[in-house]
């Protein structure tokens, strides 16, 4: 339960975060001159300009995405819809400036939602308010030890930069800083997982197809999430499926009842049914449309060498292990969700797909919760959290 004073702190923290992350952009606009014009982007400039191109397409009347960077025949894809809609809110003169301003308003809005969703999800498991705040700050702003490679002059170790510098899904800050559609998608993913774990379904002998209101609500939320990043629906359903497998093991060991597993299965079924239209559309279009297939072939988001993931997460892993051990002793159903997430992650990020790295979405938040839970379970707060 989030109290009123927590909401005030959360709003203030969110505003401070989006203000600080806006400073580099404000400096860019303030220092442009007659000889050069600030593009509106600090990192990922090519991606940023592509978002502006999508907004121009929206202004021109398009409701489906067609890239302007090729003359390959295109029917249009139901993707990047938020940017197409933003473009429809602009008009000459100074249209590019309007688009850049709308992009950053979208970034601020998405950043606030991401901060709020992270805090809400964390609060379900962490009871001490001061630790909730530290965990939220770490979840949205934190990183691993990748910076050490930069200091040591090994920035291209194993052929890639440290994950902190280019992978928004591995942590979170880059989404908040420059990729609003991913920040908003993470917020929706976390809210769905929050609803899934907050209301534990009651064990019963009811039919597997009995309506589950929570499952329907999550399905609708994730269906909407699909307009921002459809792959996160796969992540969410995949996580719940992994959790169900973990619960089945618990039931087999007679730690929980099989009826409890059936109740969770019912919830998963309704989530999948309601969010399925977006998944089915993408599956069909990206396997049959020639342009979509060609676009997917070049859209490679591969995971780096495993050393980079170890360097990214090694600092929290020991605390997360101890935290999960304590968590499991008090709440096996919820703890098994985080345990399942950690076990499937290595297989996901090296699965034979072109978007490996995207499948790490949200894991950083789970790792932070598991690590902070160890501190939360202590009877005395550490001095540095007083």
Residue ranges and their predicted role:
Residues 115, 119, 123, 190-201, ...:
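Hydrophobic transmembrane alpha-helices
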Residues 21-190, 194-197, 230-234:
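Active-site lumenal/periplasmic loops and adjacent helix-entry segments of GT-C-fold
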Residues 234-235, 355-380:
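Hydrophobic/aromatic-rich transmembrane helices and adjacent perimembrane loops
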Residues 166-167, 186, 190-191, 195-223, ...:
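Short hydrophobic alpha-helices at membrane interfaces in multi-pass membrane enzymes
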Residues 1-5, 198-216, 245-266, 322-333, ...:
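Membrane-interface junctions at the ends of membrane-embedded or membrane-associated helices
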Residues 343-356:
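Transmembrane-helix signature of polytopic, lipid-linked glycan biosynthesis machinery
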Residues 112, 183-194, 318, 361, ...:
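Alpha-helical transmembrane segments of multi-pass membrane proteins
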Residues 47, 221-332, 353-355, 359:
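Transmembrane catalytic cores of multi-pass membrane glycosyltransferases
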């Amino acid at each position: 339960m989030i109290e009123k004073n927590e909401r005030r702190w959360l709003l203030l923290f969110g505003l401070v975060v989006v203000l600080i992350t806006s400073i580099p952009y404000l400096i860019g606009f303030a220092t442009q001159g007659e000889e050069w014009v600030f593009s509106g982007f600090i990192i990922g400039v090519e991606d940023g300009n592509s978002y502006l191109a999508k907004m121009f397409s929206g202004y021109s009347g398009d409701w489906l995405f067609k890239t302007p960077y090729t003359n390959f025949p295109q029917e249009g894809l139901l993707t990047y819809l938020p940017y197409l809609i933003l473009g429809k809110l602009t008009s000459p003169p100074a249209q590019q400036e309007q688009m850049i301003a709308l992009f950053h308003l979208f970034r601020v809005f998405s950043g606030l939602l991401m901060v709020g969703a992270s805090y809400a999800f964390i609060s379900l498991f962490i009871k001490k308010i001061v630790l909730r705040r530290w965990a939220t700050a770490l979840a949205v702003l934190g990183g691993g030890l990748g910076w050490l490679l930069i200091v040591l002059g090994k920035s291209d170790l194993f052929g890639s930069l440290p994950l902190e510098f280019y992978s928004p899904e591995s942590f979170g800050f880059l989404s908040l800083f420059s990729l609003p559609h991913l920040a908003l998608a993470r917020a929706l993913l976390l809210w769905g997982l929050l609803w899934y774990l907050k209301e534990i379904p009651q064990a019963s002998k009811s039919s597997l197809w009995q309506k589950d209101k929570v499952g329907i609500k999550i399905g609708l939320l994730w269906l909407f999430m699909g307009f921002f990043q459809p792959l996160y629906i796969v992540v969410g359903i995949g996580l719940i499926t992994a959790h169900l497998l973990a619960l089945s093991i618990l039931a087999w060991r007679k730690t929980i009842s099989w009826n409890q597993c059936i109740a969770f299965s019912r919830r998963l079924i309704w989530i999948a049914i309601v969010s399925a239209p977006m998944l089915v559309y993408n599956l069909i279009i990206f396997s049959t449309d020639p342009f979509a297939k060609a676009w997917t072939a070049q859209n490679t988001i591969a995971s780096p060498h495993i050393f980079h993931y170890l360097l990214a997460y090694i600092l929290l892993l020991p605390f997360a292990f101890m935290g999960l051990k304590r968590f499991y002793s008090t709440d096996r159903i919820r703890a098994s969700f985080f345990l399942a997430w950690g076990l499937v992650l290595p297989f996901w990020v090296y699965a034979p797909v072109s978007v490996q790295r995207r499948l790490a979405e949200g894991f950083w938040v789970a790792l932070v919760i598991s690590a902070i839970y160890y501190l939360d379970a202590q009877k005395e707060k550490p001095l540095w959290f007083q």
